[in-house]
């Protein structure tokens, strides 16, 4: 098991299987329960498939200390693959946190790639800079911008970026997604973390504000002719959209 990933196993633990009134297993319910159990085990396996090293684990520890959300390892691995496959030289990250996602992205980007990362919390960016230093990332490869993304994003150039990661303030996801699409070049990828919102998005009975916002963002991208979307179960859900 991956060090520091205990919460992954806890969150993936399946519930009890259904039983008939005479205490014999209902075959149909048993099959569903077995499938769910296998799915949970597969999710944990996929999250731990690419292990995090000491730099990432320390950044994750800082996130826990600051009460700052961080992408799970499965999402980080996907982001690294995306950055590498796109040869992404210009990336925008909305929500720096303590640099967990940033490190994954930088590892996938070419040596001359530049990550522009935005966070309203200066303390978070200070922690991220410590992670960048531990990783040995040259200062020229990161542009850390303190401030509200809603104020910063409009100042960035249209169609100039290969990859945009949305991972902060779910209330503002609709705005960030629209801004992200504006920033992407044709063939660029928008990535939205937390797209399943702790399994609430898939439950139509859940109608709280954040869940509704995240669900509508997914529906909007699914019907948007400007993009080709896909929803991955990695981490807490990773919604991807390729700009046509």
Task: Please annotate each region the language model reported.
Residues 2-163, 170-191, 195-244:
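A short alpha-helical cap/connector motif
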